[in-house]
Amino acid sequence: MLNVLQKLKIPWNVSNIAQNAASAAICYHPFLEKSRNLIKNENQFLKKSISKIKNFSCYNSSTNFILLNTKIKSKTLQKKLLRKNILIRDCSTFRGLNENYVRIAVKKRKDNLKLIKALEAI
């Protein structure tokens, strides 16, 4: 009987406190609306800014991530940005992509400006 129950158990446990916090966050509409607006506005700002930078182009996204195509190898770009405390995702292992793709996160304006300045300097 115990073996059967263990097979049905989800691979991780979520505490009651975490469940309640998630429920409260989902129900807190002002926060969700503010977050959606921030992501939408900063996403547009990043795409517009990056499109002006040589060697970079970006794909449309309605999420808090943007896929970039770069003429710089993804691992090289990742290392250069890491030196400036900026994390990006190397997408060379993603199916259908190669070493010329990275993913950036849409963040607050201050962080996005830091990323743009770093990309311009490369």
Features from the language model and the residues they span:
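Short loop segments at secondary-structure junctions
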Residues: 1, 27-28, 70-73, 109
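Residue-level signal for well-ordered alpha-helical positions
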Residues: 7-8, 80, 118
